């Protein structure tokens, strides 16, 4: 199979269970099966919409793929690399290629850091250039994401509207030059008019940076607008 047609992400029989504990000794008495046997693939520059009601496990799927939550069982391969068995420097390098945009833009941003510091943190960790090069990079990303790179770079998250904060979140995800982004309810907390702006921005950025998205939402109309394919989750499956 050619590289262009080979899936970027392959998820097979993914399970993420959380133990139920009770008693004085916190004995495990059962399991909450948040994700119970999910399988799908995602191509390069493709968007897969993952839709389902609240509590169905769709957010857990996204975070399990990135290993923000450790899965119980299953297989996750990214560009042929076994994500679940990767550790140390290899995992760090892999995480540079896989990013996430969170639902709550305010809760996901450090209130004590300026936008400039938030956006430059990832490039510094991954040694993507000197201070001048990184600053130029994040100023370009701010401009590309609809933020003012001169006036906004030294502001704090509380000084922005919800839509602007989500733009910061998008720029942060792009700051390390990823290939795959989990959009975890990325527009759900925004007004309808702002939702359309953010979705159009994500589509433009996908074309420009050749990104693949796992777009998680509970609103089927939103998912259909941005997605190439749609998968539906119900009770972890």
Where are these regions (language model features)?
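ABC ATPase NBD coupling module
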Residues: 25-29, 83-99, 125, 131
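Helix-to-loop junction immediately C-terminal to a conserved catalytic motif
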Residues: 66
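Hydrophobic anchor residue at the start of the ABC signature
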Residues: 170, 182, 198
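P-loop NTP-binding/switch modules centered on Walker-like glycine-rich loops
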Residues: 53, 190, 194-237
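Conserved ABC transporter NBD signature motif
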Residues: 74-82
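Conserved ABC ATPase signature
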Residues: 156-160, 164
